[in-house]
Amino acid sequence: MTSVSLGMPAAPPPVLAPRRKTRQIKVGSVGVGSDSPISVQSMTTTPTTDINATLQQIAELTASGCDIVRVACPSADDAEALPIIARKSQIPVIADIHFQPKYVFAAIEAGCAAVRVNPGNIRKFDDQVKEIAAAARDHGTSIRIGVNAGSLEPGILKKYGKATPEALVESAVWEASLFEEHGFHDFKISVKHNDPVIMVAAYEMLAEKGDWPLHLGVTEAGPAFQGTIKSATAFGALLSRGIGDTIRVSLSAPPVEEIKVGNQILQSLNLRPRKLEIVSCPSCGRAQVDVYTLAEQVTAGLEGMEIPLRVAVMGCVVNGPGEAREADLGVASGNGKGQIFVKGEVIKTVPESQIVETLIEEAMRIAEEMGEADGEDAVKGGPVVSVS
């Protein structure tokens, strides 16, 4: 039996700073905080009342690598749908509650793993913390105190004039103190803003105030490209300093795209084991092959492979051979041909028309050998692919 030694680490190496020490809470079966892996969340876009559509979207999110899912609960009809959704979902469900405190209790009774509360817009929220804490404790439900720049309490807005980092943190710490006064500690906190600079400052400030697990998010981040940049910038700044215990990338895009981006951010910081990664040059005047098309074809051909494999697609002889040698599998193209490398060794030279086919064949061979060595199928699921 042949085993394949790959260049990428099996376990994530240390990040730039040690992980911040926090208490641990449970969101269903998923630990958040302390030494629990950083989880990736998303939120459904279907009407919660459409139970089948919501469960279908949750299944798609689960398949893409989502750890925790949030569903909206703006009405009594939505609240009535929660028990079935919570019971049938493959991953923990969080109910997202605004305005009406009665839906907090409904979500807890429905069996949701957690409830997100927005203290800035739930009527008389502070007066009901004692009852919410008691209900959550009785049902083993955790809470997210979700402070948002767009819905801060009027008193705090008046004090600070706008949603500053200090305003976000003051709101969060106040609500945390109320829960703790009633002996409830199973909560995490978020202080979201649509400006990554303000968001980062708020989380850094909040991290100094207590040992609460922190849910990272840039609110209203925007369309896919803009939102990805904002989230990657903010999350990278915080996670590299050890701040953050669960993340949600907010995009004006299908929820599955949020999971792809979130997983890629964690993998890029070595906070989650890498899977399939495509390394390709940006192309330039030296390129002797259509790198864009080649990279897209290789990416499409390897879709569905869940192996820690780095594949290099290079377009010329300047950096091509070196990059290809550093990868587990790669090609350096030029003069109508492609040199195929496996672990730094040239195994063959093929015509340009056969590059994609050859790379896919070699990747499949490596995957099969890994599957035999591990006693499991390594060619399944959906990879997180980056073409740079």
Curated annotation (Swiss-Prot):
Protein's name according to its UniProt entry: 4-hydroxy-3-methylbut-2-en-1-yl diphosphate synthase (flavodoxin)
SUPFAM superfamilies tied to this protein: Dihydropteroate synthetase-like (SSF51717), Nitrite and sulphite reductase 4Fe-4S domain-like (SSF56014)
Keyword line: 4Fe-4S, Iron, Iron-sulfur, Isoprene biosynthesis, Metal-binding, Oxidoreductase
Pfam families: GcpE
UniProt xrefs under InterPro entries: Dihydropteroate_synth-like_sf, IspG_bac, IspG_bac-typ, NO2/SO3_Rdtase_4Fe4S_sf
Gene Ontology molecular function: 4 iron, 4 sulfur cluster binding; 4-hydroxy-3-methylbut-2-en-1-yl diphosphate synthase activity (ferredoxin); 4-hydroxy-3-methylbut-2-enyl-diphosphate synthase activity (flavodoxin); iron ion binding
Gene coding for it: ispG
Disulfide bonds: none
Matches recorded under HAMAP family: IspG
Reactions it catalyzes: (2E)-4-hydroxy-3-methylbut-2-enyl diphosphate + oxidized [flavodoxin] + H2O + 2 H(+) = 2-C-methyl-D-erythritol 2,4-cyclic diphosphate + reduced [flavodoxin]
Family note: Belongs to the IspG family.
Organism, as annotated: Pseudarthrobacter chlorophenolicus (strain ATCC 700700 / DSM 12829 / CIP 107037 / JCM 12360 / KCTC 9906 / NCIMB 13794 / A6) (Arthrobacter chlorophenolicus)
Binding site for [4Fe-4S] cluster: 281, 284, 316, 323
Domain of life: Bacteria
Gene Ontology BP annotations: isopentenyl diphosphate biosynthetic process, methylerythritol 4-phosphate pathway; terpenoid biosynthetic process
Co-factor binding details: Binds 1 [4Fe-4S] cluster.
Keyword match Iron: yes
Coiled-coil annotated spans: none
Enzyme Commission number(s) of this protein: 1.17.7.3
Functional note: Converts 2C-methyl-D-erythritol 2,4-cyclodiphosphate (ME-2,4cPP) into 1-hydroxy-2-methyl-2-(E)-butenyl 4-diphosphate.
Record Gene3D superfamilies: Dihydropteroate synthase-like, Sulfite Reductase Hemoprotein, domain 1
Cofactor: [4Fe-4S] cluster
Metabolic or biological pathway: Isoprenoid biosynthesis; isopentenyl diphosphate biosynthesis via DXP pathway; isopentenyl diphosphate from 1-deoxy-D-xylulose 5-phosphate: step 5/6
